[in-house]
Amino acid sequence: MAQGKGFGFGLGKIKELQEAFQKAQQVQEGAKQLQDELEQMSIEGHSSDGSVTVVMSGNQEPRSVTIQPTALEKGAEELSTLVTEAMKDAYSKSTDTMRQKMEELTSGLNLPGL
């Protein structure tokens, strides 16, 4: 009677699987720390003329908006534009920071697709 080949899992495959689980655990632990770190950050965005400042967390949670009196004098439509500019700037900086931190977290782990 011929011997079966089993499931095709040799010792090498088991070791690879263990390494993959360890990497996943490292990423999970690092992601939790990163989430906490991003939550504590305050990232500022500014309008083109600097009269409006928006502060967001590293997780893109809005924290505050500061509007200089000169911006109020420009009227509702211009003020809306300035607030939008500041929000976009803060959001862009926040997502760039998050992306950079994620790259730091996953660098050296040799994860496919990252």
Curated annotation (Swiss-Prot):
Cited PANTHER family: NUCLEOID-ASSOCIATED PROTEIN YBAB
Q: What is this protein called?
A: Nucleoid-associated protein PCC7424_2224
Pfam families xrefs: YbaB_DNA_bd (PF02575)
What is the originating organism of this protein? Gloeothece citriformis (strain PCC 7424) (Cyanothece sp. (strain PCC 7424))
Q: Tell me how this protein assembles.
A: Homodimer.
Q: Which SUPFAM superfamilies match?
A: YbaB-like (SSF82607)
UniProt-listed HAMAP family: DNA_YbaB_EbfC (MF_00274)
Q: Which UniProt keywords apply?
A: Cytoplasm, DNA-binding
Q: Name one GO molecular function term.
A: DNA binding
What InterPro entries does UniProt report for this protein, alphabetically? YbaB-like_sf (IPR036894), YbaB/EbfC (IPR004401)
Q: What does this protein do?
A: Binds to DNA and alters its conformation. May be involved in regulation of gene expression, nucleoid organization and DNA protection.
Per the record, its GO cellular-component terms are: bacterial nucleoid; cytosol
- What superkingdom does the record give? Bacteria
Q: Which family does it belong to?
A: Belongs to the YbaB/EbfC family.
Q: Where in the cell is it found?
A: Cytoplasm, Nucleoid
